[in-house]
Amino acid sequence: MTQVIEEAVKKVLEESKPRNFTQSIDVVITINDLDINKPENRLDEEVLLPNGRGKDVKIAFIAEGELAYQAEQAGADLVINKEKLEELGKNRPEAKKLANSYDFFVAQTDLMPTVGRFLGPVLGPRKKMPKPIPASANPETILGRLRSTIKIRVKDQPIIQSIVGSEDMTEAQVAENIDAIMDVLDRNLEKGSKQIKAMYLKTTMGPVTRVI
């Protein structure tokens, strides 16, 4: 399977016209025999890509004191303190804008009740509620992991779509990333990857190539 995927990635890159930006590579997977009316079949999983996403990820860190300082030093895109949380709670348009602008949210454990109160209504429906972490956590480690993480979800159709890399990565690197997704499907689908009906790859602006 890995060789088949590598060949498909090569074809996708060859058929994609040069652009003035680095294009992402996306995978689309359709699934057989998945009753999405059953909540347990609506996949919502995080996948750590071994070679990274190939694209920047925006991460907001909700913390106070030393943890907030460390998060800022580690390169968090935004650090939100308790005072800012309360301000966002009074400004729903700004809170929605924040929710749409960031890929991941992380929050100091003892701030989670405040987060739930002020940001829960906008983050919850977007499946972006923060991961709680203790004040002693290492922000650099957390940020590094999240920058290589994607979310795969099945909502109202038995389809998964996600970024798996960028055109400046090698075929092998993209294939390894897709293998990581396949591993998650193997663990979460009743019949594993045998339930995959079809898989497609494409660059941001390029044509679609069928893999299987």
Swiss-Prot record:
A Gene Ontology biological process term: translation
GO annotation, cellular component aspect: large ribosomal subunit
InterPro entries: Ribosomal_uL1 (IPR002143), Ribosomal_uL1-like (IPR023674), Ribosomal_uL1/biogenesis (IPR028364), Ribosomal_uL1_3-a/b-sand (IPR016095), Ribosomal_uL1_arc (IPR023669)
Pfam families (alphabetical): Ribosomal_L1
Subunit details: Part of the 50S ribosomal subunit.
Protein's job: Binds directly to 23S rRNA. Probably involved in E site tRNA release.
Family in the record: Belongs to the universal ribosomal protein uL1 family.
Protein name: Large ribosomal subunit protein uL1
Naturally occurring in which organism (per UniProt): Methanosphaera stadtmanae (strain ATCC 43021 / DSM 3091 / JCM 11832 / MCB-3)
